[in-house]
From Swiss-Prot:
Gene, per the UniProt record: ugpC
Keywords carried by this UniProt record: ATP-binding, Cell inner membrane, Cell membrane, Membrane, Nucleotide-binding, Plasmid, Sugar transport, Translocase, Transport
Pfam families attached to this UniProt entry: ABC_tran, TOBE_2
Keyword match Nucleotide-binding: yes
Protein name: sn-glycerol-3-phosphate import ATP-binding protein UgpC
SMART domains the UniProt entry points to: AAA
Membrane topology: Peripheral membrane protein
GO molecular function: ABC-type glycerol-3-phosphate transporter activity; ATP binding; ATP hydrolysis activity
GO cellular component: ATP-binding cassette (ABC) transporter complex, substrate-binding subunit-containing
Phylogenetic lineage: Bacteria, Pseudomonadati, Pseudomonadota, Alphaproteobacteria, Hyphomicrobiales
Length: 349
């Protein structure tokens, strides 16, 4: 196990295309960090730089007490789990697990001990003599994780390992990965574009945008106190509603105390914090009339997609099956404590 430290790391392609812009990050020993952001934000590039698969243009990366800028991947004491499993198709599961250890001249007894331990923890003991083509997608991903575990590395690096699995398997494997990481206590860096996956796995989230860090914090910190409008809309599903004060607030009303902050340009409200007006307790409130455009039933709740009088979209949640009709007008409200405020640059006020 080890700490991982990045100091002012940059990555530039062809001299002027900046993929990573001055990233600094300290990852504690045993911590599970998730790098999350939209496509092209630099999360996979950053992971590959930690792994040594991608060179850095400037800055410093340390694993434990060693600066690893000039070290090969095999010298960094890390193990990586890829999106495409990267299993040898002509080898059995047992051979896939042992291959890297044999190349490092690990004693046979130690190889068998590590394989037995990993196979038991991952529940792949019945499959040790099968080849990858005889396994399901979830079983292959477990084998890929097992190959990383038997290395007993200082850190695990995960590059979107669940993206090839169906929704049910993704949930199962999320739980499995978190359980294993806690049991092993190994420092882990995980890349995903799926904010739900990020929220459920991470000790801390690192939200990237355009090669820069937007915010670092626990999932609940980022959800409840997003530092920027970008983080506010990226973390949470459906996204936070952002209402632009520059378009005029004739479509909604709120006490002056809620909208009179100096520099205020945008108000944010999460869909789950909006209720039908009659369901909201008293006190200072945001209120608006919404024309219903669509209703999504997602089981125990529904999401209503509508528009305000000025054309701005608004999404809100209602319990159970909504009886609202398309083009119906309803009044909604939100209490003062649920509002978020951002300036013209998208920074939290």
């Amino acid at each position: 196990m080890a700490t991982i430290t990045l100091k002012d790391v940059h990555k530039t392609y062809h001299g002027d295309i900046a993929a990573i812009r001055g990233v600094s990050l300290a990852i504690a020993d045993g911590e599970f960090i998730v790098l999350v952001g939209p496509s092209g934000c630099g999360k996979s590039t950053l992971l590959r730089m930690i792994a040594g698969l991608e060179s850095i243009t400037s800055g410093e990366i340390s694993i434990g007490d060693r600066v690893v800028n000039g070290l090969e991947p095999s010298e960094r004491d890390i193990a990586m789990v890829f999106q495409n499993y990267a299993l040898y198709p002509h080898m059995t599961v047992r051979q896939n697990l042992s291959y890297g250890l044999k190349n490092r001249n690990t004693p046979k007894e130690e190889i068998e001990r590590r394989i037995a331990k990993a196979a038991k923890s991952l529940e792949i003991e019945p499959f040790l003599d099968r080849k990858p083509r005889q396994l399901s997608g979830g079983q292959r991903q477990r084998v890929a994780m097992g190959r990383a575990i038997v290395r007993e590395p200082a850190a695990f690096l995960f590059d979107e390992p669940l993206s090839n699995l169906d929704a049910k398997l993704r949930v199962q494997m999320r739980v499995e990965i978190k359980r294993l990481q806690r049991a092993l206590g190994t420092t882990s860096v995980y890349v995903t574009h799926d904010q739900l996956e990020a929220m459920t796995l991470a000790d801390r989230l690192v939200v990237l945008n355009g090669g820069r860090i937007e915010q670092v914090g626990t999932p609940i910190e980022l959800y409840e106190n997003p530092a920027t409008a970008f983080v506010a809309t990226f973390i949470g599903s459906p996204s936070m509603n952002l209402l632009d004060l520059n378009t005029g607030n004739a479509a909604w009303s709120a006490p002056a105390a809620l909208v009179g902050k100096p520099g205020l340009a945008t108000i944010g409200i999460r869909p789950e914090d909006i209720t039908l007006a009659g369901d909201t307790d008293g006190g200072e409130r945001f209120r608006a009339r919404v024309r219903v455009g669509a209703v999504e039933l997602v089981g125990a709740e529904s999401y209503v997609h509508g528009t305000l009088a000025n054309g701005e979209p608004l999404v809100f949640r209602v319990a159970g099956r909504s009886r609202m009709m398309i083009d119906e007008e309803v009044e909604v409200a939100a209490v003062a404590g649920s509002l978020h405020w951002f300036d013209a640059a998208g920074r939290r006020l």
